[in-house]
Amino acid sequence: MSEEQGAATDGVILDYDVRKVMAALPHRYPLLLVDRVASLTLNERIHAVKAVSMNEQFFQGHFPGRPIMPGVLQIEALAQAAGVLAVESLGLAGSGKLVYFMAIEDAKFRNPVEPGVLLDLHVEFTQKRSRVCKFSGKAMIGDKVTCEVNFTAMIADS
């Protein structure tokens, strides 16, 4: 693991800031929804964080007077965290490969996400087969689950 990838100990990567997230993902503002990685265990799990600010563009219309982060964007944030997990675990950084999501299953929205919170993004690999990976994700604010989802992704050329 290089210094640029963050501090690594026994397959755990720490100190992974937004610059490193941007090196792993093709997403950019306003659709980059992972601000940092708190921890990543190669081939297992990731805990990423999204700081939800009132300045997010989606709050202008969802909903005026009662801003709530759209559920599909919570799923997208989890998918991006899974993308970072896959890129790091499978050694895809700089390879020209992208993580494309193919299926979303069992999505459940439990609690609203309002401005001013840190949204914790917890994603685990549930299955890996050559170019297809399955994940289970949970978004949380503190100990409250806001969203749960299972999804499938494919590794493909960009």
UniProtKB/Swiss-Prot annotation:
Task: Spell out the CDD domains in the cross-references.
Answer: FabZ (cd01288)
Query: What is the enzyme's class at the highest EC level?
Result: lyase
Q: Where, subcellularly, is it found?
A: Cytoplasm
Major subcellular site = cytoplasm
Reaction(s) this enzyme catalyzes, per UniProt: a (3R)-hydroxyacyl-[ACP] = a (2E)-enoyl-[ACP] + H2O
Q: Does the keyword Cytoplasm apply?
A: yes
Q: What is its EC number?
A: 4.2.1.59
What is any one of the record's Gene Ontology cellular component terms?
cytoplasm
**Active-site residues annotated for this sequence:** 62
- Looking at the Swiss-Prot or TrEMBL record, what is one Pfam family this protein matches? FabA
Family as reported in the entry's similarity comment = Belongs to the thioester dehydratase family. FabZ subfamily.
Q: What is this protein called?
A: 3-hydroxyacyl-[acyl-carrier-protein] dehydratase FabZ
Source organism per entry reads: Novosphingobium aromaticivorans (strain ATCC 700278 / DSM 12444 / CCUG 56034 / CIP 105152 / NBRC 16084 / F199)
